[in-house]
Amino acid sequence: EVDFVLYGNKGIKAFEVKRTGKISGHMLKGLKAFQKDYPSAKMYFVYGGERRLREGDIEIIPLNDALKELPVILSWAVVGV
């Protein structure tokens, strides 16, 4: 299970969003399961912390950064952009 998925002409992006400022491995379980079914998808974990991290192919992004990048993330999923 993931919170939401974007699909467009450049592929799939899957997102898990948590309010917490701390990350534990079990929080990434849904993204890892989704990635098994869709290995080419880009995975994002958005959380309430302050550090940008990476866990394997999962990009871990602070909420503030994700909000600033939202126009880019959304335009990526629009067909023809």
Segments from the language model and where they lie:
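A cross-kingdom feature that marks ATP-driven nucleic-acid transaction machinery
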Residues: 1-81
